[in-house]
C-alpha cells in the first residue's frame, strides 16, 4: 500500500421510497408529533413564504444545529440567500422540507433531484441549447428518478424527538402523488465515519442502509510521526 493509511471512510446511504419502511417505534413517535398542534412540517412553497424567508429559516437552524461542531463555521444571512439562489434552477419545492414549532424553524431536510440521469445525454456539453435540453429533462419530462439529500439538521433542544423522521414521513406521504411518484429512492452521500452521530441518525431515524463507501487515505512524509485517523466531530465547548 506504499505507506498510505485509512484516514476516514465516507458512506453513501440508500433508502427506497415507499410507505411502511419505518419501524413501529418511529411511526409512534411521528404520530405523537402530529397530535401536537405546535409542531408543523411543510415543504417549500413560495406562495406561503419567500425564498428569502426560507433562506433565513435555513440559516437559523444551521447555525444552531451545525455551527457548534468543530470545524464548522456559522453562516451569514447573505451567504444563506446566495446558497438558495444557486439552487433555484434545480429546486423541486416538494423536496425541500422544514419543521416548525410555534411557527419558528427547528429543522430542515433539503433534497434535490439526482442530476446524473438528466445530465448524461448531454455528454459533457453545456452550451445554450444543452441548457434548454437540461431544463426540459429536469422540469418537463422529469427524467430524475432518484433524490439526493443535501443536508438535514435539527436544533439541539429538539433533537431526539423524531423531528427528522417527521420530515421524511411527511415527504413520503407525497411520494405517490402525480408530481412525485417518479422518484423511487433517496441517496444520502459523503457521511464520514468521523461523524458517528450523523451515521446513527441516518440509520435509526431515516432508516437508510449503507450502499457505497469511499475511503480517503493519508501518507505521512515524516515516517517517525505517529499516524492517527481523522478526529471525530465533537461539539464546541462554550
Model-based region annotation:
Residues 1, 5-20, 94-97, 101, ...:
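Active-site/acyl-donor-binding loops of N-acyltransferases
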Residues 27-28, 86-90, 207, 229-231:
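Short alpha-helix boundary/capping motifs
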Residues 2-70:
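Acyltransferase donor/substrate-recognition loop-hinge adjacent to the catalytic core
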Residues 40-154:
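A conserved beta-strand-loop-helix scaffold within acyl/acetyltransferase catalytic domains
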Residues 25, 79-82, 197:
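Exposed alpha-helical structural elements
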Amino acid at each position: 500500500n506504499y505507506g498510505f493509511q485509512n484516514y476516514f471512510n465516507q458512506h453513501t446511504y440508500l433508502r427506497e421510497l415507499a410507505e411502511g419502511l419505518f419501524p413501529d417505534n418511529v411511526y409512534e413517535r411521528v404520530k405523537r408529533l402530529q397530535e401536537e398542534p405546535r409542531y408543523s412540517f411543510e415543504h417549500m412553497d413560495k406562495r406561503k413564504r419567500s425564498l428569502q424567508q426560507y433562506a433565513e429559516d435555513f440559516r437559523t437552524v444551521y447555525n444552531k444545529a451545525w455551527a457548534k461542531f468543530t470545524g464548522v463555521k456559522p453562516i451569514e444571512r447573505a451567504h444563506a440567500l446566495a446558497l438558495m439562489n444557486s439552487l433555484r434552477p434545480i429546486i423541486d419545492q416538494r423536496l425541500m422540507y422544514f419543521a416548525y414549532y410555534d411557527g419558528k424553524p427547528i429543522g430542515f431536510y433539503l433534497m434535490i433531484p439526482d442530476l446524473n440521469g438528466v445530465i448524461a445525454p448531454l455528454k459533457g456539453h453545456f452550451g445554450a441549447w444543452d441548457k434548454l435540453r437540461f431544463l426540459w429533462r429536469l422540469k418537463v419530462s422529469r427524467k430524475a428518478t432518484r433524490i439526493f439529500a443535501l443536508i438535514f439538521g435539527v436544533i439541539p433542544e429538539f433533537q431526539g424527538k423524531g423531528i427528522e423522521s417527521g420530515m421524511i414521513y411527511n415527504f413520503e406521504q407525497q411520494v405517490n402523488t402525480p408530481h412525485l411518484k417518479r422518484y423511487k429512492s433517496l441517496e444520502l452521500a459523503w457521511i464520514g465515519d468521523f461523524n458517528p452521530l450523523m451515521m446513527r441518525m441516518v440509520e435509526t431515524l431515516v432508516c437508510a442502509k449503507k450502499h457505497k463507501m469511499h475511503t480517503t487515505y493519508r501518507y505521512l512524509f515524516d515516517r517517525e510521526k505517529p499516524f492517527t485517523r481523522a478526529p471525530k466531530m465533537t461539539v464546541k465547548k462554550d
